[in-house]
Swiss-Prot record:
InterPro entries: Methyltranfer_dom (IPR025714), SAM-dependent_MTases_sf (IPR029063)
One Pfam family from the record: Methyltransf_31
Annotated protein name in UniProt: Uncharacterized protein MJ0906
An example Gene Ontology molecular-function term: methyltransferase activity
TM region(s), chain numbering: none
Domain of life: Archaea
Source organism of this protein record: Methanocaldococcus jannaschii (strain ATCC 43067 / DSM 2661 / JAL-1 / JCM 10045 / NBRC 100440) (Methanococcus jannaschii)
Length: 366
């Protein structure tokens, strides 16, 4: 155990004692350290996964409220309340250049039943109720919430054009900005969950799809010097940052490639594939999964983590996530476990699949 015995001595003082506020805080720290040291690794892993899931569930509520607020701010709900228009009349009533964005908003609101069709006209659904579950605030990673606050803010530029420079710049940030985002607690926790579950160790061969700038050093530290790490990313800038971090520490044992993963030549040599927040950008899910399965040997595992897997949590409002993520032209969509299983079966693979929380799937090739 790592707790400081000097702290205990300072508090108890070797006899009877009274605990003041400061002493109580010190004892709380000691108790937390002891509990953390003796807590089984499975429980620690479960708590980390719960942190991720709670963050996304809270974010779903926040995005839904923001979506409704935008309906008022953009003048969409007032127009519908006043005119009860047909869908074809919408482009004539809105004042913004990007009519498609307004139509996309209305279609999403219809799916959410915030709006409704009645006699071929669109109307406000006055029976819509917004039920929000009070989140566990001590289990929310606030930095990831801030990321979406930024995305929803730039959505107003889509009223002009989906290709507005403000939107394009937001999703093509300077690599240094993305490097800072990838170092945040949310993404750091995602890396920890992957390494804890897979029990990554020296000698392992890892393929990291969409590795970014932070994952390479994190995973190479674990497998060096006997193992091998291959990091693939479409951002040359992020790979350059990663290279600067690792080239002086490791003379070999790794490769970083600035290519689209679907264009690599698969080799059945990897023990593990890490695919974190990347699958939603795959142009073809079938091709993407086939490439990953072709890159691991029998017994190898693919660790897929996304914000959520469809149908895992009824409290997740996928429609609002999809609406705002469409601002990124590379976004393709979220998938269910069934989507993945059906594709793998159609490709003829033998596999086992395990679900961890609401956003992680682990596929083992048999």
């Amino acid at each position: 155990m790592k707790f400081d015995s000097a702290k205990i001595e300072n508090v108890v003082g070797g006899g009877s004692f009274e605990i003041g506020d400061d002493d109580s805080k010190i004892l709380d720290e000691i108790i937390s350290e002891v509990i953390n040291d003796i807590m089984p690794s499975e429980i620690k892993l479960k708590k980390k996964i719960e942190m991720i899931d709670n963050t996304i569930e809270y974010l779903s509520y926040e995005l839904l409220v923001t979506f409704i607020k935008h309906g008022v701010e953009f003048g969409i709900f007032p127009i519908i309340a006043k005119y009860s228009p047909k869908i074809d009349d919408i482009p004539l009533l809105v004042k913004y250049p990007n009519k498609q964005f307004i139509l996309d908003y209305i279609k999403t609101a219809l799916k959410l039943e915030i709006l409704k069709y009645e006699d071929e006209k669109i109307k406000i659904n006055e029976d819509f109720e917004l039920n929000i579950k009070m989140p566990k605030f001590d289990k929310i990673i606030s930095d990831y919430v801030m990321k979406y606050n930024f995305i929803t803010h730039v959505s107003r530029y889509a009223l002009i054009s989906y290709s507005h420079p403000k939107i394009a710049i937001s999703f093509k940030k300077d690599p240094d900005i993305w490097d800072m985002i990838l170092s945040s607690p949310y993404y750091s926790l995602c890396r920890e969950i992957a390494s804890d579950y897979l029990k990554i160790d020296k000698g392992d061969y890892i393929l990291d799809v969409g590795c970014g700038s932070r994952s390479p050093k994190y995973f190479i530290d674990m497998i060096y010097p006997e193992g091998h790490y291959m990091g693939v990313d479409i951002s040359k800038g992020l790979l350059q940052i990663a290279e600067c971090r690792i080239k002086r520490l490791y003379c070999d044992s790794y490769e970083l490639k600035n290519i689209d993963f679907t264009k690599i030549i698969p080799k059945e040599k990897y023990d593990y594939i890490i695919c974190s927040h990347t699958m939603i950008y795959a142009p073809s899910l079938k091709q993407f999964l086939n490439k990953m399965m072709s890159s691991i040997h029998s017994g190898g595992k693919i660790f897929i983590s996304e914000e959520f897997i469809l149908d895992k949590n009824e409290n997740i409002c996928k429609e609002v996530f999809e609406f705002y993520n469409r601002l990124n032209k590379r976004f393709r969509g979220y998938y269910s476990e069934k989507d993945i299983v059906d594709i793998l079966e159609s490709l003829g693979y033998d596999f086992k699949i395990e679900s961890l929380g609401n956003g992680i799937l682990v596929i083992e090739k048999i």
